[in-house]
Amino acid sequence: MAAISASAPYVARDRDLRNRALVRGWLYVVLLVLFALVLVGGATRLTESGLSITQWQPIHGVIPPLNDAEWQEEFQRYQQIPQYTELNKGMSIEAFKSIFWWEWAHRLLARSVGLVFALPLLFFWVSRRIERGLGPKLVGILLLGGLQGAIGWWMVASGLVDRVSVSQYRLATHLTLAALIFTATMVVARGLAPHSEPAADRSTQRLAGFIVLLALIQIYLGGLVAGLDAGLSYNTWPLMDGKIIPGDLLILEPAWRNFFESPKTVQFVHRLGAYTVFAVALWHMIATRRRLPGSTHARRATLLFVLVLVQASIGIGTLLMQVPLHMALTHQGFALIVLGFAAAHWRGTKGAYPLPQEIVLRS
């Protein structure tokens, strides 16, 4: 009679490890493309190119204008929006082409991310390389990507009628969702990686997760700063307007609007957010080194603090230099590096996803 042995070795373990390595490698490629997409999106914003394409054509929009007549048609559409009539009137078609290519590249890269994610996902699913429990996570990321495309057009549409730029609310939402997709992808990839040490204690896990949350909030605040050009408002540090706490922070009515619409208040809150991330990362490093001396968790916590310190220095430099394009892009890109490492560290404190278990029948 057959007996069930739960302790029998899982015969497919090697296959599962190989599948995990393949899926993890694919997700790392997705992360690289996402990182490039965020950088190109930042350059599109900083060069004020985001409104140069006034239509959303998911399929036909892949093909740019191919002759003079098509370029004139595209330019005429741009000439009908407030950004042209109020800011760029008299722009030459050559100048228009320079901003058009940034936005076109951003949209093309966004479409590419969708393909880089969806097609391998379909292949891995059909070939049964996606283990149980992983499918919903990956489908969730795919759905977030679809939502991000819709939010991207929702953001662009806000600048086509009554404004000369996009809504800072929508810009911050678009940037934060990109960061959330990046975080989710990193967490899944890290969960599939081998871990050299057991999971950390609950307190270390919670604080590591809290840093991820703080980093996401700080990126949202950075989106508001970008949307309002608030980085150009006060280019001194550590003082603002000659004070630690500047005046007129609540000048708008109702008061909540100041935290989203006042450049001074938004920059001040972004500074406070940076100080908070710095302080919590420092505390996390000290606490982890005390609880788990010499561990991989402690080394990662130390590196995370160093990354936060570097990012803070880049932010201060960007402010003092009055937001040059290369510094602003570096600040945005390094924010994603800090976030990605924080997410990987948090998943690392929890350990790898359990390997699938199988009950083996023996006679």
UniProtKB/Swiss-Prot annotation:
<feature type="transmembrane region" description="Helical">
    <location>
        <begin position="207"/>
        <end position="227"/>
    </location>
</feature>
<keyword id="KW-0408">Iron</keyword>
<feature type="transmembrane region" description="Helical">
    <location>
        <begin position="174"/>
        <end position="194"/>
    </location>
</feature>
<comment type="function">
    <text>Catalyzes the conversion of heme O to heme A by two successive hydroxylations of the methyl group at C8. The first hydroxylation forms heme I, the second hydroxylation results in an unstable dihydroxymethyl group, which spontaneously dehydrates, resulting in the formyl group of heme A.</text>
</comment>
<dbReference type="InterPro" id="IPR003780">
    <property type="entry name" value="COX15/CtaA_fam"/>
</dbReference>
<keyword id="KW-0812">Transmembrane</keyword>
<feature type="transmembrane region" description="Helical">
    <location>
        <begin position="323"/>
        <end position="343"/>
    </location>
</feature>
<keyword id="KW-0560">Oxidoreductase</keyword>
<protein>
    <recommendedName>
        <fullName>Heme A synthase</fullName>
        <ecNumber>1.17.99.9</ecNumber>
    </recommendedName>
</protein>
<feature type="binding site" description="axial binding residue">
    <location>
        <position position="331"/>
    </location>
    <ligand>
        <name>heme</name>
    </ligand>
</feature>
<keyword id="KW-0479">Metal-binding</keyword>
<feature type="transmembrane region" description="Helical">
    <location>
        <begin position="107"/>
        <end position="127"/>
    </location>
</feature>
<feature type="transmembrane region" description="Helical">
    <location>
        <begin position="138"/>
        <end position="158"/>
    </location>
</feature>
<feature type="transmembrane region" description="Helical">
    <location>
        <begin position="268"/>
        <end position="288"/>
    </location>
</feature>
<keyword id="KW-1133">Transmembrane helix</keyword>
<feature type="transmembrane region" description="Helical">
    <location>
        <begin position="21"/>
        <end position="41"/>
    </location>
</feature>
<feature type="transmembrane region" description="Helical">
    <location>
        <begin position="301"/>
        <end position="321"/>
    </location>
</feature>
<dbReference type="GO" id="GO:0006784">
    <property type="term" value="P:heme A biosynthetic process"/>
</dbReference>
<dbReference type="GO" id="GO:0046872">
    <property type="term" value="F:metal ion binding"/>
</dbReference>
<feature type="binding site" description="axial binding residue">
    <location>
        <position position="270"/>
    </location>
    <ligand>
        <name>heme</name>
    </ligand>
</feature>
<comment type="similarity">
    <text>Belongs to the COX15/CtaA family. Type 2 subfamily.</text>
</comment>
<comment type="subunit">
    <text>Interacts with CtaB.</text>
</comment>
<dbReference type="Pfam" id="PF02628">
    <property type="entry name" value="COX15-CtaA"/>
</dbReference>
<dbReference type="GO" id="GO:0005886">
    <property type="term" value="C:plasma membrane"/>
</dbReference>
<dbReference type="InterPro" id="IPR023754">
    <property type="entry name" value="HemeA_Synthase_type2"/>
</dbReference>
<keyword id="KW-1003">Cell membrane</keyword>
<keyword id="KW-0350">Heme biosynthesis</keyword>
<dbReference type="GO" id="GO:0016653">
    <property type="term" value="F:oxidoreductase activity, acting on NAD(P)H, heme protein as acceptor"/>
</dbReference>
<keyword id="KW-0472">Membrane</keyword>
<comment type="pathway">
    <text>Porphyrin-containing compound metabolism; heme A biosynthesis; heme A from heme O: step 1/1.</text>
</comment>
